[in-house]
Amino acid sequence: FECDVWAIEEGSVIFPHEPIVTVRGPLYQVQMIETMLLLILNHQSLVATKTSRMVRVAKGRAISEFGSRRAHGADAANLGARAAYIGGAAASANTYTDRHLGIPATGTMAHSWVQSFDGELESFRAYAEVYPSACLLLVDTYDVLRSGIPNAIKVFNELNEKGYRPLGIRIDSGDIAYLTKETRKMLDAAGFEDAKIVVSNSMDEFKIRDLLNQGAKIDSFGVGERLITAKSDPVFGGVYKLVAMEEDGKIIPKIKVSEDVVKITTPGFKQIYRIYNKDTGFMEADLVCLHD
């Protein structure tokens, strides 16, 4: 492989119409890597961008990636979890990425755990026995406010007597805004002001923003299918285009023209300079110019 490759540092903010990766070398070699390069960049940039949007609207509340079961295959699940972490997710329910990539693993009990016992309280006690220092209970299998939270509080009191503080509860269905407000009141009244409320169920940046605008009492979000598939906009339109040829040591710009304006390429071997405010340290603009 005789090509030179320049790339924006992974995890950096990048804007439309800017080169993310530039490859310079023999034309046949440059062309051979097109499909794989676009496959990697488009998929993972898509998921990282979607995650970043959710992280921003969550306003400091953790976003955890829960999407493997709805991903478009094993590679999409694993690489999507990686991209989500780069995009700002705090953790992933994908244990492969924990073991092989060092991404923190997270997760809670399943509804099937609760259903496999004769009663909800029994299932909570069994879970607390296994995870006394990391007890986070799923409370919506039957009835959140009449059953789930009262039973969780009973188990939390039992843990407290043994010297453990519970992590909290998770709600995966129902009127999330209303249920979290009532849950917060019940937990606080029982002396568990530090217990966290985690929610899931088809979350994305739009639903997260709506819940927070309603005053929902949420500490973190588990986000699945709408993150791992970027459901609202599932295609990242990155392209790989010839922009220059070198002839006798001279760079000759090349352009693709079209009646469709968005299909017209920007010619030339380019370089990006990012401009920061010297007083605030904030990014202010990008300058795209010719490499020389």
What are these regions (language model features)?
Residues 2, 6-193, 204-207, 213-214, ...:
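Buried, small/hydrophobic-residue-enriched core segments of structured protein domains
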Residues 111, 200, 224:
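Residue-level "edge-of-site" marker
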Residues 188-190, 195, 203-292:
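Gly/Ser/Thr/Ala-enriched C-terminal appendages of enzymes
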